Regions:
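Secretory targeting and sorting signals
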Residues: 1-28
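Catalytic cores of phosphodiester-bond hydrolases, prominently lipid phosphodiesterases
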Residues: 33-358
Length: 358
């Protein structure tokens, strides 16, 4: 179990077994599934389980199957370059769509019609599923912009907001919903700004991160995270923050406050979501993960299966997966991410963050 204390891990594991011992009633029907965590518990005081690249056909036949899994987070990869049309959803095809989305108009179409739709089609299916499952658990939709925004091609931050709003509308939990009367996101969460889980029922939180191609492009000097944070700051200054639909994440685990990487200190308060390698967060003293929980920041811990001792990334035993979730909950994960798509009893579990809440 690495350097995580046995006491903390045991406490979190016990909580996991109590709260997530079997699939909750909403694992297949989309119910909120948060009752075990306590109706009044803040969203930021719980740990859920997410699925990496849930849009791939090898993961689920249809994206609605991913939504039905009970997972707390589902990931989409999106391409924006000028050599293709629209916002493409694919892992490795930068020019077209390769995914399990069907552009459903309603619940009857969630498993019919052609797949390989663009982001708008994926979001249409999300909305159709949402309408068929009122009060469903809160779900993070993690969008990796593989090659970043392309504002000159009509695929910049404002265009993404418009698309998300057109497709998901009132199903979105927006930055403005969190900010309230505070000056920025950081001030809001430090004041206890995340609502209770039951108040988040029926909502989607959109997280956006820089993509692998973008990060490797020496000509791209304005990555997704910084570009969207600038967008948020500008909207807030203009009194139009309500138009924003997503939360930019600081990508990459690091000791201290990772936001210090942004030379423009005025951008830092617009980041309250952090996303990085689970092994680094679980490594012990180099990262004070309790700092994130104390301040109400969300932390997505990726590649959970690679934390020592490594377990299977797709088909571990249920006991192995539950123990891993408990270990990372003890390290203050908000979302534990891997490819455990068939373990619906684990995906639908909600445990106290830190083992016993913040």
């Amino acid at each position: 179990m690495g350097m995580v204390s046995r006491t903390a891990t045991t406490a979190a594991l016990a909580a996991a077994l109590i709260l997530g011992g079997a699939p909750h009633a909403g694992a297949r029907d989309g119910g909120a599934g948060a009752a075990g965590a306590g109706a009044g518990v803040a969203y930021s005081d719980t740990t859920g389980v997410g699925v990496h690249n849930a849009y791939e056909k090898s993961a689920y036949p249809y994206f609605t199957d991913a939504l039905d899994s009970g997972a707390a987070m589902l990931e989409l990869d999106v391409w924006t370059n000028v050599f293709g049309r629209s916002w493409r959803v694919s892992h490795s095809n930068p020019l077209g769509n390769d995914n399990n989305c069907v552009n459903a108009a309603n619940a009857d179409g969630l498993r019919t019609g052609p797949r390989d739709q663009d982001l708008g089609g994926c979001l249409a299916s999300v909305r159709a599923w949402h309408d068929a499952h009122p009060g469903h658990r809160p779900v993070v939709l993690k969008i990796e912009l593989k090659d970043g925004f392309q504002g000159k091609a009509g695929r910049g931050p404002a265009a993404l907001d418009a698309l998300l709003t057109a497709r998901l509308g009132d199903a979105l939990f927006r930055p403005a919903d969190l900010v309230g009367g505070h000056p920025d996101l950081d001030a809001a969460v430090r004041a206890g700004g995340w609502p209770a889980r039951d108040a988040m029922a029926g909502k989607f939180v959109v997280e956006i991160i820089p993509g692998t191609v973008e990060k490797d492009n020496p000509l791209d000097t304005l990555w997704t995270d910084r570009e969207y944070a600038q967008h948020l700051r500008g909207l807030a200054a203009a009194g139009r923050l309500r138009e924003a639909s997503a939360f930019p994440a600081v990508l990459g685990a690091a000791a201290g406050d990772p936001r210090t990487r942004y030379a423009d200190a005025g951008l830092r308060p617009w980041f309250v979501v952090f996303d990085g390698d689970a092994s680094f967060y679980a490594g012990g003293g180099s990262v004070d993960t309790a700092w994130y929980a104390r301040n109400g920041y969300l932390v997505v811990m990726t590649d959970a299966h690679k934390v020592a001792p490594a377990i299977d990334g797709v088909n571990p035993t249920e006991a192995q997966a539950r123990e891993r979730v408990a270990l990372l909950a003890a390290r203050h994960a908000s979302v534990v991410s891997s490819d455990w798509r068939s373990l619906t009893s684990v995906l639908s579990s909600v445990v106290p963050r830190g083992g016993a809440g913040r």
